[in-house]
């Protein structure tokens, strides 16, 4: 099992990172909280989780061990696959997710693409006990992570990132269009667009 990879960021295309590890390029899908911290040429350590299916093997990467643990915990919930787990971690910060579960906030969870009311309620029931220990180590701040990202096309990058979460192209375009005038960085546009869609 590959527990973590240390290497240089070779290419970025939301939400996938191509990581050069001693001359071998690993394609790793990441939540936006991790993706938006990365820059081409940067040396990084990504905590990884490998999913093996009949038709493919896919690596998922995270900036820290806690986020990886949360991802694995989400996968244990009936009906939650890697794509949905990644979408949850991309839309909600670890702190907000823990806060949401602690306070039975179904309305926040259903704003994540692909999460309906039944899935949200199942997440609440199955994660409540598992998240009690996490709640002690995190604040309940309802903010998305502070992220920095360098891109030649901030608007296009933001739209692509939102679509990778499961938002429809028109939804992503509208959300980005509503906030793009106020920001110049992709990460800021993504964060503001996500916040606007969570209202």
Swiss-Prot record:
Q: Which SMART domains match?
A: HhH1 (SM00278)
Spell out the subcellular localization from the entry.
Cytoplasm
What is the originating organism of this protein?
Acinetobacter baumannii (strain SDF)
Would you tell me the protein name for this molecule? Holliday junction branch migration complex subunit RuvA
Q: How does it assemble?
A: Homotetramer. Forms an RuvA(8)-RuvB(12)-Holliday junction (HJ) complex. HJ DNA is sandwiched between 2 RuvA tetramers; dsDNA enters through RuvA and exits via RuvB. An RuvB hexamer assembles on each DNA strand where it exits the tetramer. Each RuvB hexamer is contacted by two RuvA subunits (via domain III) on 2 adjacent RuvB subunits; this complex drives branch migration. In the full resolvosome a probable DNA-RuvA(4)-RuvB(12)-RuvC(2) complex forms which resolves the HJ.
Q: What's in the keyword line of the UniProt record?
A: Cytoplasm, DNA damage, DNA recombination, DNA repair, DNA-binding
On whether DNA repair is a keyword of this UniProt record, the answer is yes
InterPro entries, sorted: DNA_helicase_Holl-junc_RuvA_I (IPR013849), Hlx-hairpin-Hlx_DNA-bd_motif (IPR003583), NA-bd_OB-fold (IPR012340), RuvA (IPR000085), RuvA_2-like (IPR010994), RuvA_C (IPR011114), RuvA_C_sf (IPR036267)
